[in-house]
Each structure stands twice: as C-alpha cells, then as structure tokens.
C-alpha cells in the first residue's frame, strides 16, 4: 500500500510539474489605444494560440501608445506589439527622416536590434501614413491618381484640414514646396469634422490617415504620394529577441501575416470596429479565416 501511495505521489508531482511547465509557456502582447492596433494584436494572439501551445496574455489599449509600450518592452513586461516604421524611426530611435520605405524598414530593423535587441518581423502589407484623399468619382473623372495629378488641377478644388496642418513644415507648407499645390481655397476644419465636410461637398480634398475606417463609408480615394513627401508608416510585429530565443517557432507563426493586409482591408476592418462596433477579436478572427490562416 505504501509503495502504491508513493507511486501515486510521484505521478502527482510529475503531472504538477508538467502543468507548471505548460503554464510557463506564455507571451504578452500589447496594443495601442486605437482600433487598428487592437485588431492586429488579436490577429497575432489568435495565430499564436492556433499554431502553438503558447498561451497569450493581452495588454490592450495602453495609454500613450509607443511612449509607454517601449519602456515596458525594455523591462520585459511585454513581449511584442504591432508598430509602425515611421514611429519607430522618428519617435523611438529619433533619427532623421528617410523617405524610401524599403530603406526605412531596413534601417529601423537594424536600429532596434542594435539598440534594444528587438526584432522587426516582416511587414503586414499596409501603410498607415498621412494622406490626401478625395471623392473617388471626382478623382476618376479628373484622372487624379497621385499628388502630382492633384497639384496640376488644384486650382479647381478646396482643401479641408485642421489648423495645425497649415502651420507645420511637414504639413501643408512642405507639400506646397514639394508639389506646387495652389488650391482654390483652403479651409480650417476640426479634425473630427473633415469627413462630414467632404461628404457634404463643403471641401473637395482632406488630409487624413491612409487606413482610416471612414474612408470606406465616404468612398474616398487615397491619392499616391508619388514623391514620398510623407514618411512611411508600414506596420509589423516588434518582438523581443529573448522571446524569440525562448520560443523560436513564433517567428514563422507571426510572419504568416506578412504581406496579407492591404490598406483597403485595414480600412474596412477599422470601420467594422469604429463604426459598426464589432469586437476587434471577431474582426481579426474573420479576417484570418478568410485568408486561410486559422
């Protein structure tokens, strides 16, 4: 009986240790306080849990975004999060602007590895940068695809933007110097009212972000910044190298997102969350399933 009891105790210890080891397989994913970041963080977590035995803890909507996530990554409190090349280069590494998107990605990846031992994984595909947009039908009727096209016809149109866009050198003054814009009129419009203004025909062109969810609702065309005036804000997973060393399978799993998300797809997903109030978790799941990734 004593021998049997000892065997049971030994087996209990083995199972308990196995349970502890399994519980230790965990990563922490952070997101910024915006729909896009919530959605991508969910995609990352769902892929990890679907293709490995690693558990995921989410720290969502971290106030201050990069300014608070970066130190938490350095402290090992967060393992990974979705970030933008322009933000990493200009805000974290504090370097001078690089206009070429491919060069920017290569340099920001090198800078993060050298400075923080963080790895930038492959790009998701979309670029959430500053943009100029106009009604799709109007753009097509006038053959406007690029900023240069718009500049050539700008005397016919009215631009709507928030006040500080007209004051910043990396805003309207810089665009005028680069492209030669000469709009018929420029209007100061509150940042939250720009889409309503263009929808009502009060303005013809607005500044915005290229993956804004409302672009879909108002059927606006994001014009191509053909001289690359605005920096690229291409998105990718940033992960601690220590985490990859511990769970090397994560790189292949997370890179399933590489090149999978277009600007238009990200716009639509943002719209579902911001306008239709769908849960980011559900939006992420439906997208991954549509791509055959789950």
Q: How would you describe each model-predicted region?
A:
Residues 16-19:
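C-terminal motif of bacterial Sec signal peptides marking the signal peptidase cleavage site
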Residues 23-37, 54-61, 155-161:
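Short, well-ordered beta-strand elements
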Residues 35, 57-71, 163, 184-196:
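Short helix-initiation/N-cap motifs at beta->coil->alpha
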Residues 47, 67-78, 173-178, 191-206:
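Short helices/loops that flank or line small-molecule/ion binding pockets
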Residues 50-61, 155-158, 176-189:
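A local structural motif
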Residues 92-121, 202, 214-228:
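Ligand-binding "clamshell"
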Residues 104-158, 259-263:
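A conserved helix-loop-strand patch within extracytoplasmic ligand-binding domains
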Residues 129-140, 234-247:
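A bilobed periplasmic-binding-protein/Venus flytrap-type ligand-binding module shared by bacterial periplasmic
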